[in-house]
Amino acid sequence: MLSTGVKSLDELLGGGFGEGVLTQIYGPYATGKTTLAVQTGLLSGKKVAYVDTEGGFSPERLSQMASARGLDPEEALSRFLLFTPGDIREQRRVIGSLKRLITPEFSLVVVDSITAHYRAEEDWRSLTSELGKQLQVLLWIARKHRIPVLVINQVHFDARAERTRPVAEQTLGYRCKDILRLDKLPTPGKRVAILERHRFRPEGGMVYFKITEKGIEDVSD
């Protein structure tokens, strides 16, 4: 297990993010998905492969989080290997290259988000197949190296169901054993994490957290 650095969230997840599996983290904009992924990598003390498809990764934010926790910002930045694919084909090449790049020095792989370029394309049928292949590569990496792979996902509004759902829900749901949803609350800075699926933890559990200069913290801290 890889700790998130948040006691209540670790307890919800059964100790942290599972090794050897894909964990999907999804939710609306600005709910803390990227912050959670970055914080987990920061606190791991090892290298992190971060695939940023939306330009959401901020070196300044990582430095702020490290400094606020008494860690060396430069050392923290040096541990993050950043990739910025510009389209779904480049994303495929980047994810494929991770099979050769990941070594025992790495503690985590993050794809943020897996569906950003997917939504920009029109040929949904072929892209669903392409997305499935990329997820299979990520699952291979997770299993081979016994590390967590975090797959961050966006949401869309399903008019028929009258609620938001994760993009490419079936494709990701088939391969992601653990699914965590993040949502906003009316109170500024406060968020809720809901465990929608887990290999051994009860589904539907939830915890509250806040976003601070340190990253993500328990609301009681």
UniProtKB/Swiss-Prot annotation:
Q: Which UniProt keywords apply?
A: ATP-binding, DNA damage, DNA recombination, DNA-binding, Nucleotide-binding
Example GO biological process term?
DNA repair
Q: Name one GO molecular function term.
A: ATP-dependent DNA damage sensor activity
InterPro entries hit by this protein: DNA_recomb/repair_Rad51_C, DNA_repair_and_recomb_RadB, P-loop_NTPase, RecA_ATP-bd
Q: Name one Pfam family in it.
A: Rad51
Source domain of life: Archaea
HAMAP family noted in UniProt: RadB (MF_00350)
Q: What does this protein do?
A: Involved in DNA repair and in homologous recombination. May regulate the cleavage reactions of the branch-structured DNA. Has a very weak ATPase activity that is not stimulated by DNA. Binds DNA but does not promote DNA strands exchange.
| Record family assignment | Belongs to the eukaryotic RecA-like protein family. RadB subfamily.
- Protein name, per record: DNA repair and recombination protein RadB
Q: Gene behind this chain?
A: radB
